[in-house]
């Protein structure tokens, strides 16, 4: 799944409008709609803001994993041993 679908799904799953998310990001609803359609690439600052807003990892939004939250650092270190 690509980030276009993920950002739409996250927004819809939390019952937010495009306008609400656009206001949070400090952009227009029109521009945010373009992100959701894939007509414009989303700036990294907006990706980071959405990760914080939805409490998910960038890897999840970008489609690299289906795990929404990153592993706690204590678990990452225990797997390296």
PLM regions and their residue ranges:
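Conserved hydrophobic/aromatic packing and binding residues within compact polymer-binding modules
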Residues: 7, 21-22, 32-35, 61
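Recognition helix of helix-turn-helix/homeodomain-like DNA-binding domains
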Residues: 25-41
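Short, charged recognition helix plus adjacent turn
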Residues: 62-81
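A detector for short, charged/polar N-terminal pre-domain segments
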Residues: 1-5, 69-71
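DNA major-groove recognition helix of helix-turn-helix
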Residues: 36, 54, 65
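Short basic helix-loop element that most often maps to the first helix and adjoining turn
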Residues: 5-24, 49
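DNA major-groove recognition helix of helix-turn-helix/homeodomain DNA-binding modules
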Residues: 26, 45-60
């Amino acid at each position: 799944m690509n980030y276009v679908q993920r950002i739409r799904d996250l927004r819809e799953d939390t019952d937010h409008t495009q306008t609400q998310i656009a206001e949070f990001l400090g952009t227009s609803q029109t521009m945010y709609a373009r992100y959701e359609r894939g007509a414009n690439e989303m700036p990294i600052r907006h990706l980071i803001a959405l990760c914080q807003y939805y409490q998910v990892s960038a890897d999840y939004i970008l489609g690299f994993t289906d795990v929404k939250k990153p592993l706690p650092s204590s678990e990452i270190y225990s797997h390296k041993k």
